[in-house]
Amino acid sequence: MSHDGKEEPGIAKKINSVDDIIIKCQCWVQKNDEERLAEILSINTRKAPPKFYVHYVNYNKRLDEWITTDRINLDKEVLYPKLKATDEDNKKQKKKKATNTSETPQDSLQDGVDGFSRENTDVMDLDNLNVQGIKDENISHEDEIKKLRTSGSMTQNPHEVARVRNLNRIIMGKYEIEPWYFSPYPIELTDEDFIYIDDFTLQYFGSKKQYERYRKKCTLRHPPGNEIYRDDYVSFFEIDGRKQRTWCRNLCLLSKLFLDHKTLYYDVDPFLFYCMTRRDELGHHLVGYFSKEKESADGYNVACILTLPQYQRMGYGKLLIEFSYELSKKENKVGSPEKPLSDLGLLSYRAYWSDTLITLLVEHQKEITIDEISSMTSMTTTDILHTAKTLNILRYYKGQHIIFLNEDILDRYNRLKAKKRRTIDPNRLIWKPPVFTASQLRFAW
């Protein structure tokens, strides 16, 4: 079974040895006291015993992992993939497809950019608000990758998204973390059981001895940039990708372990990185970060955003999002994150947008327009309307759309206030929007 779910069921066969297991076959694997059907994506025989990289069918890709042979149930049949069509059949299929395409050469020119009709482009379809920027919900995995932006922080190699996770465990400070995805660390590190990543420089090592020797000599105790925000809880540093290429590339390599579609680890020059840290007696420990393009043609205020796994589910994600909008307010701009968001990223943004909109509407207590909400929050009108529709507070009344507050919204507002979650204090932000000339925005300036 492929990730897009289009491949037909395979051929069931009983086997006696794991030597008969091949890539793309499916077998039953022990996982958390239950058996799950898993697809073999890769086989590693460089070290004994052999290991198999598996994707659990109908489960999230971040659960993919390396397993040993003892977890594979050979008592059940293995599904082998069906043989692909012969080369002659493929040629006929391609020829037929080319003929069909040539019959309507003007089809692609009938529509506007990105497939939108050139007519009625000023009309907003409130039933089809697309906060993810993906046109078709039925789009396949391969088509989705092809449609990703080729600028910003999107991966530009479609095969890269499907690569096998190459690191087993990383040790960062006092935390041991299991990566989720592939990241292009040096190949000599991929056979190590643990990779050591320095808490402050993000430099990586294949052995504990190398790491400890490096740590004794290194004096850096915070991200190598300007501290632009500090309160009793967190600090924020601004780092220019051009001025701190090595550190920013190390950051991108680390974040790629936990982000699937996003990848930028060589060309960091066009980006600014805003890193959130927690302080202790040792220094500033990285909690999460977001990056943004120095000049975004699409008006994005965030390119990549990540809270490190050891700090997730603690409220740091909302602080990162809130801080990105505080920067947009300082710039007197509206902004939105680069699309598509990861599943966790979309959940975090939806929660932030909902909380922000509910708080504003309840506390404002006067009539207010969508444009005024956008100006006060720096959220785009599309994100505001999407959030209002999700909250079910958008209604069509007497020829216009209105937002109304119901009891559920008021109850949610009261619960928000009772939580007393931490927020960003705009008065503690010491920052002016950086200005770059055309020559400064060019690569290798």
Swiss-Prot record:
Domain of life, per lineage: Eukaryota
Domain comment (free text): The ESA1-RPD3 motif is common to ESA1 and RPD3 and is required for ESA1 histone acetyl-transferase (HAT) activity and RPD3 histone deacetylase (HDAC) activity.
PANTHER family registered for this protein in UniProt: HISTONE ACETYLTRANSFERASE, HISTONE ACETYLTRANSFERASE ESA1
Binding residues annotated for acetyl-CoA, in chain numbering: A303, C304, I305, L306, T307, Q312, R313, M314, G315, Y316, G317, K318, S342
Motif (ESA1-RPD3 motif): 245-266
Record PTM text: Autoacetylation at Lys-262 is required for proper function.
Protein name: Histone acetyltransferase ESA1
